[in-house]
Amino acid sequence: MKRIVIKVGSHVLTEDGSIARERMMALVELIADLKKHSYEVALVSSGAVAAGYTQLPLDRDDIANRQALAAIGQPLLLKMYQEKFARFDLLCSQVLFSADVFESDKHVSHAKVAIDTLLANNVVPIINENDTVSIEELVFGDNDRLSAHVAHYFDADLLVILSDIDALYDKDPNCFQDARRRAVVNEIEEEELAAEHTPNNEFATGGIVTKLQAADFLMKHGREMFLASGFELSDVKSFLIEGEHKGGTLFTSTKRS
């Protein structure tokens, strides 16, 4: 059985200032389908701040407010997931990590036992950073770094990032009509990793750079990452279920012909 981590970003899960319920439903349906095809799936989900904002519209530019919104929104987000997974007779669980959990072998070991047990019992772990006490991903990263660490330390074969960025291109496709998709990337240049990040929207804190940093981390540890659109899931379905690489970008240190 192949183990994967799927990370969905804020831009995919939010629409008009609240949770995009149809996109969330499509994501849950994808995970249910993957499980039928013998995948173990853990989900790293953003969206807590957006969910909290629907109940208390605080200024999101203030870090303390974002922490408060995340605290309000996290249980709301989980409830939405629980209702949708129940339609497929699936249980989901909430797993919150503090930023320093991956700095301790003991903490990683304990967390892995919990994740392994959940997956062995057909439960979908829904993972997020505990934004009330850990603010780095809340400020910058949109869980890209967290998802890479989850994939590595919990022995996933692949990290799938579903984003408003549907692939890596040789130049900015928003500015250049002749931009070409890079289907497979074996190495990321240092200047690509050091470029200034570009926030996606009012709820998102990442951009292509944090995704490249996640991919670079995984490739250096012998693991792979697939970047694809979270708005239209045909590319990720083709890649994971049909074994066809029609869209998106695969980051792998293994050269493929």
From Swiss-Prot:
<feature type="binding site">
    <location>
        <position position="143"/>
    </location>
    <ligand>
        <name>substrate</name>
    </ligand>
</feature>
<dbReference type="InterPro" id="IPR011529">
    <property type="entry name" value="Glu_5kinase"/>
</dbReference>
<feature type="binding site">
    <location>
        <position position="46"/>
    </location>
    <ligand>
        <name>substrate</name>
    </ligand>
</feature>
<dbReference type="Pfam" id="PF00696">
    <property type="entry name" value="AA_kinase"/>
</dbReference>
<dbReference type="GO" id="GO:0055129">
    <property type="term" value="P:L-proline biosynthetic process"/>
</dbReference>
<keyword id="KW-0963">Cytoplasm</keyword>
<feature type="binding site">
    <location>
        <position position="131"/>
    </location>
    <ligand>
        <name>substrate</name>
    </ligand>
</feature>
<dbReference type="InterPro" id="IPR005715">
    <property type="entry name" value="Glu_5kinase/COase_Synthase"/>
</dbReference>
<comment type="function">
    <text>Catalyzes the transfer of a phosphate group to glutamate to form L-glutamate 5-phosphate.</text>
</comment>
<feature type="binding site">
    <location>
        <begin position="163"/>
        <end position="164"/>
    </location>
    <ligand>
        <name>ATP</name>
    </ligand>
</feature>
<keyword id="KW-0808">Transferase</keyword>
<feature type="binding site">
    <location>
        <position position="7"/>
    </location>
    <ligand>
        <name>ATP</name>
    </ligand>
</feature>
<dbReference type="GO" id="GO:0004349">
    <property type="term" value="F:glutamate 5-kinase activity"/>
</dbReference>
<comment type="pathway">
    <text>Amino-acid biosynthesis; L-proline biosynthesis; L-glutamate 5-semialdehyde from L-glutamate: step 1/2.</text>
</comment>
<feature type="binding site">
    <location>
        <begin position="205"/>
        <end position="211"/>
    </location>
    <ligand>
        <name>ATP</name>
    </ligand>
</feature>
<comment type="similarity">
    <text>Belongs to the glutamate 5-kinase family.</text>
</comment>
<keyword id="KW-0641">Proline biosynthesis</keyword>
<keyword id="KW-0028">Amino-acid biosynthesis</keyword>
<dbReference type="InterPro" id="IPR036393">
    <property type="entry name" value="AceGlu_kinase-like_sf"/>
</dbReference>
<protein>
    <recommendedName>
        <fullName>Glutamate 5-kinase</fullName>
        <ecNumber>2.7.2.11</ecNumber>
    </recommendedName>
</protein>
<dbReference type="GO" id="GO:0005829">
    <property type="term" value="C:cytosol"/>
</dbReference>
<keyword id="KW-0418">Kinase</keyword>
<keyword id="KW-0067">ATP-binding</keyword>
<dbReference type="InterPro" id="IPR019797">
    <property type="entry name" value="Glutamate_5-kinase_CS"/>
</dbReference>
<dbReference type="InterPro" id="IPR041739">
    <property type="entry name" value="G5K_ProB"/>
</dbReference>
<keyword id="KW-0547">Nucleotide-binding</keyword>
<dbReference type="GO" id="GO:0005524">
    <property type="term" value="F:ATP binding"/>
</dbReference>
<dbReference type="InterPro" id="IPR001048">
    <property type="entry name" value="Asp/Glu/Uridylate_kinase"/>
</dbReference>
<dbReference type="InterPro" id="IPR001057">
    <property type="entry name" value="Glu/AcGlu_kinase"/>
</dbReference>
